[in-house]
Each structure stands twice: as C-alpha cells, then as structure tokens.
C-alpha cells in the first residue's frame, strides 16, 4: 500500500490541514459580486477542469507511486473536476437510505476499497506580493491524500467540508504537478450515512489562494440590535503577525457608513476586535434581505464580505428574529442533479433557490451536510433562513442485527455504537466545528444543527456544548436527541429547539398541552414522495395556531435520480435504487421531492405555494363587499408586497376581472378590510377568486408573479351549476321505438340511434353503440382499485390482502321493466375477490331513456371488516380517439380530497395527454375532485357524464393495472383506449410514505353510500 491507513484511524481525521476558518475569497482590491466573481479574484487560481484519472477496484491494486514527478500517466483517462467517478462509468451508483453500503464494523471499511488517482499539471508563478499559497478542496468523498510535485502535502476527510493546506514550500515557478488519491470509504463513512445516492470523487471546487505573509486569517461577525442602532462586533485572528487592519462598512448603495480598526482582544480565541455602530439600521430578514458590505483591508490584501443585521432569541418558548415571532416555511434540500450528481454549479443552485422563493418558502435546511459556501451567500441575498447542518449521520447503526428487536433495545444499541461512544467525540466535534467555523458570518443561518439521525449521547453533548460556547447568538437543534437509552441521564441543556420528524397532529397537540419551555420545530414533515403531500393545509393550520410551533421543513426539495438518456420509446430515462444491480438499496425512496430531478415542479410544489400564500381571505360579506385579509408575512406590509387581482366566475364563465391596489396598511400577522364591488347573477355556481401578485420585482422574482390565491363560493338564488342541472334533466323524449331482447346472459336494447348490451351476470354494460359506432373497447367495470401512490405504500398491502386489486363484480339477480321513459334495469350486485368474502353489496338501478341517455343509481354497503377503499366508481374503456375533454371542477392539474388547495373551480378544456402527471415511479395520478360534469370528445361524437353530487374522475391512456405493474415511467405502455374512471370518491393522499397515517377525514371509510351518474351521447360539445 502506497499510503498510511489514516482512513481507518479515528485519531487521524486530518493531517497538515489548516485550522478551520470563515469562508472568504481574498483579493488585492474590493470585490464586487462575491458569488458570481469568486474566481475573478487576482489571488485565486481555480483548478477545476480536465484532470488525468485512473480508477482502481481496490486500494491494494494501486501499487505505483503515481504522484511522483515524471510518472507516466499515459494509461490514465480524463475526467472533469468537479465530478464523481460513477458518472464516468467507474464503479456503480448506489442509493441507500438507512443501511450502510459496507459492513457495520467501525472504524474499519472493506479491504477492497475502491479508489481514484487524480493528476493535474499546471503552471504557476509565485507572486511577490502574495507569496504564501493555500490549496483548498471544498468537497471530496470520502477521504483523500494530496501531493504537490511529488511531495506529500496531507490527508483529510469529511466529504462536505473545506480542507485547506499550506503548499507554499512545495510549489515552484513553472510547471507543477498536483496529485490526489481519493478513497471511496473511510472511517468517516460511518458518519456520512445520509439518505442519498452514494458517489465518490472530487465533487466540489479546487483552488489555490495566494496571500501575503501576514494576513487576517479568521474573523467572526456578530450583531446586536439595540434601540435605534445596531452594534456590529468583529473579532479576528491573524496568520503570521498581527498587522494594521481597517474595517469599512458600506450600505447597499455602497455608501460608506462607518470605519474602524482592530484593537487587541486579550484572553479570547480571537486576538483582535472592532466594534461598529450603525444608526437606524436596515435589518436583515427573508422578506427584506438587506445586506451591508464589510471590507477588511490589510497591506496587500482585501477581504470583502456581506453582512446582515439581525438578532435571534427565544422568549417564553417562542422564536423571535428581530423581535418578531417567526414561522419557518421551509424545505429540506440535498445536493442532487440527475446528470452531475453531487456536483452543483452556481446556476443550478440559483435555480433551486429562485424556485423556492417563488413558491413562498422562506427557509431551507442544508440536509444533511454543509453546502458549498456560495449557497449561504445566495440565501443571504435572496432572503432565506437557513438551518446549517453538520456532515453527520450514522443512521445505519440503527439497522444492526439484534436478537431483541423491540424499540427500546434498538434505541439503546443505536446510541451505544457511535453517538454515545467516547471514541467518536473528536470526529463528531470536528464535523460540527467545520460546519460552524466556515459559515459563522452568514446572517441567513439562524440555527446550527448537529446532524441527522445518529441517536444521542456523549458525542453530541460535547458538540452542543462547544457550539453554544462558541456562538451564543444563534440557536441549536438536534432531532435525534429524542432517541435515548434508559441507561443514563442525558444533558439537553445546550439544545434550544425541540425538533421532531413527521409527528402527527395529535402528537403536536400533546406537546402544546404540556406548556413546553422550548419552541417546537418540524424538522421534517409532509413527506413529498410521488403524488403528495396531501396534508399541507392541516399542518399549516396547527402551525399558525400556536406561537410555540415555529414552523417546519417539508421533506424534500427534489427527486434524486440518475439520468440515463432516452429510452427506445423516446422517453427520458431516470433510474433509482436497485437499477444498478446493487445488493443493498432502498428502491424509489429517493424519489420524494417537490420537483422532478430536472426541477419541473410536481403538483405538490404548486400545493405548497398556495397553502403558504402571503395572505388569506378571512371573510367576505357579499352584501357590503367587505373582504377581510390576513397578512401571513413576518415582516412586510401587504400593501408594499402584493397587489390583488379578483375575478368572478359563474359556471366556468368569467364575468368580471379587475386589479386592486391596496391603499391601507395590513401589517404582519394583522388583518385589514377592503371593499370590492361585484355583481353576482341569480343562478349558477359562482366563485370569487382573489389572487396575490408581487407588487415589485426582486433579484429573483418578477414583478407581477402570482404568489397564491383564495376562492370564495358566492351566494345566489340558485347556486347549482346550470349546465350540470340541464344535463341532469331528462331530455325531450323521441318517438323512436325501443326494442328489448334477452338471453340468460345479456339484455339488449335497441333503437334507430343506439344499441346497448347489458350483462346480467356483472350488472354492467357490455356494449354501448351510438349511431352505429361502438364507444367501448371493453366492457364497463365497477372499480375499487387505484395504482398505489407512494403515500399508499403502508396501506397498499392491506388493500392487496383485501383483494381490492383483483375484485370483480357479479350480479345475483337482474330484472327489467319498460315504461314511458324507456327501460329500467334492477340488479343486485356484489364486488369480491377470489378466496375472500365480498367487499360490497350493491343495489343498482339503471335507466335507459328513449333518447339514448343512461343513468344509474347505486346503493352501496361495505363490509366493515375491510380497510378503507382506494376508490369506488365506474370504469369505461372508450375508444382511443377520444382525445379531448372538458370538465367543470377543480383544475387545471390533479386534485384529491386533501390535495386540492392549488386548484380552483372552473370549466377546463384540455386533452387526455395533458391529464397524465408523469411520476417517475408510476402511480395514481391526474384525477380531479369536486366535479359537476365531464365531456369527452372525438370527431363528431361526445360522451358526457354528470352526477347530482360532485364526483371525482380520471381520464388516462394508461390503465391502473399498468401503473401498478411498471416500476418506471419510461416503461409505461398506452392501453390503446381512453380510460375513464368516474368515482363517487377516492381515498385521500396524505404523506404516509414516511409520515403519519392518513387522517380519518380523508379516508374513504363510508360503510353505506349512494352513487349516481348519468351518461349522454351526442355529436357536439
């Protein structure tokens, strides 16, 4: 072996690295845009680009000293840095959530440990004015050794932290060689068991920083808000000798506010200190992210930084920022891109954060590791609170084999392996300090999180103690402190916020009833996997009911997947866990974001945006026109933030649309009243829709952007949908003769315009032919199954055990009669699966009118032994030529009984193709709830369905069996039919893939109900 085994030594996490420090990019002059221009500094040399690379299946296969000068790299290939070697065909991708990808044997890793050798030659001229050189790696997974010009520089680990080496003595003028050996696994792997794809290599930026001999090395900026002024304290330490340092503060227009010089600061970590007073300061918050510029000047070097003035505290278990009780409207975010993997560039980062702002998020958690430094600078600029999390997760220790697998024993053993093991105190403390030190000057960071899902013990007690001792201006949290052993008492004194993952509303209420002394934070909630989440509004309501509940962070921002080009059918091909032949994986559990891998929004993101809209209508008096609004922003006056657009729709027809500029203040968390002058017709289903639009553009959002809406049902003499009412009325009867013929199996009804065949054995229609054209591809069905959503993953097995996926209808008795209207057919029907008792008993009455219209009324009784139904309704397989549809209901995108807040009532004209929501893991999608009628159309033929009560429908080219069977969307095959599901109801969506059970009010648990539907056939819309 050509390197020492530091990678299995808990005592050696770093060798020859510089002490942790705040992030900055020094220059010889004041820098402009810090993010965009970070590599434009004349003191920074970027090493990103093409490197020579050779992969080895095992560290033992690497026998040659590739790092030596003159080594022949002709056998190497070329890769881009930053990058991960799995994307270049080396090794393979693996997704695992909890379980380790290696045996649980810390600190040891498999002897066949893959590694990658990187080499880059570069020219370098030692600058006379800045002769010292520091080599920075911002992210390498999992550990690495470094050589320059054949000389060993050092070793480091902690994948998502910056490692800095002093390479002054090994660089030379002219050509130099930089060599890096990266190992896939190290002892740090046991602390990096985050829920993500596992990738390896140099995945973040590499660069040299040139500096004078004597410079400001580290500094820490804190702020205190006093009456009519802010106090900025800057503490600093030096590399080399302390030198005179001037500090200048500029406002956002780059007007000088104040200047100071450092004075000695005896007896502290930092040797020097300066205090700057700002009169009538502009405070930083996510809604008004005002930033000052701080410039630190020494001879030969300038450090430029942006600072925000804000103050954080907890009082009476309520979290305040700048004296305002806040709510985190947050999301968890991983570094993930389907093409580049862990490698996230500036534009990718900007897009994520811009979409968050547009969707009304005000906070992001860096789950579960530090992000690149400019992520936090962008959050400062765009306005997002941040929970900054250390690179620490040992969740896999929970998966150890235990003879006694009860939860108490699992929890005890989980802690003992690592989190309550004194041998891991240095590693845990190191990861915490690396996180805190680098980003301690970022105003966006409100909370330091010690990590994720490690259990609790002495390691975190020490990390929390250090964090509170070093930075008393921010708060701390650590969710896994919840998991404890009964073997000893734990120290929780340095945890400021009690955080929980996926608590039910009842669990939240229990916490509130205890009169807690710490704020409650939902560090993860509303698991957004696939078609979901469906419970955002419920959590919103309880979050805003209690000041102690300071908000939450949805899990998570994006689906994780690996893009593999186009499939043979032309569809984009995304792969997830298990698709790479890996033995240990967690399937599609990584597909749990609010956006697709390419950042196309899921409907769940649209739902979030409207649930967390900036304002809400509290009440509307139709008589006086008084509309009461409540401001749900934390800091801004509504009249300065939004303008309104209101419209009146009746039966889907737009009657009125106007813009309204707020003239009076509506302060944060307060209510205000405006007057609207609207006219409402005497009949029709009428709605007032009030939309909220951004009044002024920002650096990330365009003026006029819609930030959400409210919809109010208006009162009138006849509030029924008049089109639906007309469709329900029996049409004028024709004199056409109706003929009936009957066999043991079928009842056939014929006129000069239609021919229908009713199956007496199923109680459903076998054929529907109008004007000589058959409408159905296959017989009509009763339908209680849906392709399980990701959030059905726990109830799904109950449904399968109950036979819902294979149930069939049978009729026990069918008889008919003819009257003046036409034919009435009476059937007694059940729904059952093989080997299981019947689920449903149904008394059905069908009517065939002489006009050709068909209606049905079903009285349904469910066996109470069975679980909640996925759905109940009728399924039609229409000919595939039915490509267009109109409907009145909740749209334009999919809606369900608990996932419908981003939809509004209207008349929508669309296509079957547009109804499909193309989740990467196929599942139920594209349904619409609260509908009055549906019309499907092909050339010269329409099929209309209408009910006396609002119903749900789904129209798709894909059968629910196909959606259930296939694992990836690119594998889906169209049925050839236009499949129409007309449902009395569907089960709700929820977030039970990782969250609580679907709430009772959204479960389809009715034991008796009545379903009716009417079908009309014609030649025009």
Model regions and ranges:
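Accessory beta-strand-rich segments of carbohydrate-active enzymes
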Residues: 3-15, 33, 37-38, 52-56, ...
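An acidic-aromatic loop/edge-strand motif
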Residues: 87, 92, 99-108, 157, ...
């Amino acid at each position: 072996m050509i390197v020492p085994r530091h990678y299995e030594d808990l005592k050696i996490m770093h060798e020859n690295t510089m002490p942790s420090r705040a992030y900055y990019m020094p220059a010889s002059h004041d820098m402009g845009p810090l993010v965009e221009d970070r590599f434009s500094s004349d003191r920074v040399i970027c090493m990103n680009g093409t490197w020579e690379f050779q992969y080895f299946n095992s560290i033992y296969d690497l026998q040659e000293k590739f790092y030596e000068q003159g080594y022949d790299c002709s056998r190497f290939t070329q890769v881009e840095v930053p990058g991960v070697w799995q994307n270049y065909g080396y090794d393979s991708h693996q997704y695992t959530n909890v379980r380790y990808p290696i045996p649980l044997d810390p600190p040891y890793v498999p002897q066949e440990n893959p590694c990658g050798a990187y080499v880059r030659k570069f020219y370098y001229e030692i600058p006379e004015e800045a002769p010292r050189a520091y080599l920075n790696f911002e992210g390498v997974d999992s550990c690495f050794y470094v050589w320059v010009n054949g000389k060993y520089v050092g070793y480091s680990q902690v994948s998502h932290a910056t490692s800095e080496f002093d390479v002054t003595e090994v660089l030379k003028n002219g050509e130099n060689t930089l060599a890096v050996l990266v190992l896939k696994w190290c002892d740090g792997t046991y602390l990096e068991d985050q829920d993500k794809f596992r990738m390896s290599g140099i995945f973040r930026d590499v660069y040299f920083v040139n500096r004078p001999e004597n410079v400001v090395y580290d500094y820490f900026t804190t702020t205190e808000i006093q009456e009519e002024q802010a106090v900025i304290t800057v503490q600093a330490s030096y590399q080399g000798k302390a030198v005179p340092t001037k500090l200048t503060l500029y406002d956002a227009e780059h007007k000088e506010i104040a200047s100071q010089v450092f004075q000695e600061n005896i007896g502290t970590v930092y040797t020097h200190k300066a205090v700057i007073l700002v009169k009538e300061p502009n405070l930083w918050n996510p809604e008004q992210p005002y930033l000052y510029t701080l410039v630190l000047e020494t001879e030969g070097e300038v450090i430029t930084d942006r600072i925000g003035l804000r103050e954080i505290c907890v009082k009476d278990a309520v979290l305040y920022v700048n004296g305002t009780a806040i709510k985190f409207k947050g999301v968890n975010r991983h570094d993930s891109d389907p093409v580049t993997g862990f490698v996230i560039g500036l534009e990718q980062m900007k897009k994520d954060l811009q979409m968050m702002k547009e969707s009304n998020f005000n906070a992001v958690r860096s789950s579960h590791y530090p992000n690149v430094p400019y992520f936090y600078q962008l959050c400062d600029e765009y306005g997002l609170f941040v929970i900054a999390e250390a690179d620490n997760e040992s969740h896999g220790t929970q998966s150890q084999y235990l003879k006694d697998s009860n939860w108490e024993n699992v929890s005890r053993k989980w802690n003992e392996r690592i989190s309550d093991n004194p041998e891991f105190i240095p590693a845990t403390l190191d990861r915490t300090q690396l996180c805190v030190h680098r980003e301690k000057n970022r105003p966006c960071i409100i909370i330091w999180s010690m990590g994720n899902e490690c259990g609790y013990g002495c390691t975190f007690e020490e990390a929390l103690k250090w964090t509170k001792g070093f930075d008393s201006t921010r708060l701390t949290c650590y969710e896994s402190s919840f998991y404890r052993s009964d073997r000893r008492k734990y120290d929780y004194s340095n945890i400021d916020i009690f955080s929980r993952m996926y608590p039910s509303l009842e669990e939240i209420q229990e916490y509130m009833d205890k009169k807690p002394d710490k704020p409650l934070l939902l560090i993860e909630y509303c698991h957004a996997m696939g078609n979901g989440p469906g419970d955002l509004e419920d959590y919103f309501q309880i979050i805003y009911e209690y000041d102690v509940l300071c908000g939450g962070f949805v899990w998570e921002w994006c689906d994780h997947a690996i893009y593999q080009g186009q499939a043979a059918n032309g569809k984009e091909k995304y792969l997830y866990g298990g698709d790479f032949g890996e033995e240990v994986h967690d399937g599609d559990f990584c597909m749990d974001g609010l956006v697709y891998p390419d950042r196309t929004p899921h409907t769940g993101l649209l739902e979030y945006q409207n649930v967390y809209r900036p304002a809400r209508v509290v009440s509307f008096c139709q008589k006086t026109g008084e509309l009461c609004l409540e401001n749900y922003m934390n800091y801004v006056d509504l009249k300065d933030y939004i303008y309104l657009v209101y419209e009146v729709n009746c039966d889907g027809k737009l009657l009125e649309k106007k813009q309204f500029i707020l003239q009076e203040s509506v302060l944060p968390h307060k209510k205000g009243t405006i007057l609207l002058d609207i006219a409402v017709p005497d009949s029709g289903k009428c709605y007032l829709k009030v939309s909220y639009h951004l009044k002024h553009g920002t650096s990330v959002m365009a003026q006029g952007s819609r930030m959400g809406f409210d919809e109010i049902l208006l009162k009138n003499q006849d509030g029924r949908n008049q089109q639906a009412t007309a469709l329900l009325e029996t049409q004028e009867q024709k004199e056409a003769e109706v003929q009936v013929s009957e066999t043991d199996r079928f009842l056939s009804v014929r006129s000069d315009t239609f021919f229908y065949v009713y199956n007496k054995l199923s109680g459903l229609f076998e054929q529907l032919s109008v004007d000589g054209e058959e409408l159905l591809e296959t017989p009509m069905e009763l339908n209680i199954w849906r392709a399980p959503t990701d959030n059905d993953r726990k109830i799904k097995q109950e449904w399968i055990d109950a036979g819902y996926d294979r149930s069939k209808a049978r009729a026990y008795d069918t008889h008919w009669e003819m009257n003046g209207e036409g034919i009435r057919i009476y059937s007694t029907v059940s729904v059952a699966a093989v080997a299981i008792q019947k689920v449903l008993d149904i008394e059905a009455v069908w009517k065939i009118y002489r006009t050709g219209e068909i209606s049905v009324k079903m009285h349904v009784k469910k066996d109470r032994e069975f679980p909640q139904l996925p759905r109940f309704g009728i399924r039609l397989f229409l000919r595939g030529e039915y490509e267009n549809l109109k409907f009145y209901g909740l749209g334009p995108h999919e809606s369900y009984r608990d996932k419908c807040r981003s939809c509004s009532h209207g008349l929508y004209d669309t296509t079957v193709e547009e109804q499909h929501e193309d989740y990467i893991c196929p599942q139920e999608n594209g349904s619409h709830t609260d509908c009055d009628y549906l019309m499907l159309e092909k050339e010269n033929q329409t099929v209309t369905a209408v009910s006396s009560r609002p119903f749900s429908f789904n129209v798709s080219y894909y059968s629910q069996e196909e959606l259930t069977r296939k694992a990836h969307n690119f594998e889906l095959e169209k049925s050839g039919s236009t499949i129409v599901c007309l449902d009395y109801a569907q089960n709700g969506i929820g977030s039970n893939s990782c969250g609580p059970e679907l709430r009772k009010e959204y479960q389809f648990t009715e034991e008796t109900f009545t379903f009716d539907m009417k079908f009309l056939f014609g030649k025009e819309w």
